[in-house]
């Protein structure tokens, strides 16, 4: 049993990127993923989980920051979607649904970083609700 949950509090492109990421991982090289994470220490994973809300992409896990791991895992997911090779009417594969995640990684800013930046401008909570 695996529970896959969608991301929330984000736009359409973000909502589609979560399931696409999961599908890409499942259709990708599961042995490569297993080889990678089987070496991870449980306590370090828990620590990263607890630190991530405070430190974001700067959180360390197994000697690398979460930005590194996000990029690495996104590349694995892309390979899985390319391997799956399911095309839309425009002959584009499902990797297009990962564009939002790629932008997050390229900009090195999470949705939380953007919200903090908006709030920090004038400390007005209404800024957080404007889209």
Region roles according to the model:
Residues 1-131:
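C-terminal accessory/tail domains of diverse enzymes
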């Amino acid at each position: 049993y695996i529970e896959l949950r969608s991301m929330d509090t984000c736009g359409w492109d973000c909502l589609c990127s979560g399931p696409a990421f999961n599908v890409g991982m499942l259709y990708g090289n599961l042995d490569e993923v297993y080889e990678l994470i089987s070496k991870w220490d449980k306590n370090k994973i828990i620590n990263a989980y607890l630190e991530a809300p405070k430190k974001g992409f700067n959180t360390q896990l197994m000697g690398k920051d979460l930005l590194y791991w996000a990029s690495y895992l996104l590349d694995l997911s892309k390979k899985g979607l390319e391997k799956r090779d399911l095309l839309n009417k425009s002959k584009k594969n499902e990797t297009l649904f990962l564009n939002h995640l790629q932008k997050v990684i390229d900009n090195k800013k999470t949705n939380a970083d953007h919200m903090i930046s908006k709030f920090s401008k004038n400390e007005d909570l209404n800024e957080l609700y404007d889209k």
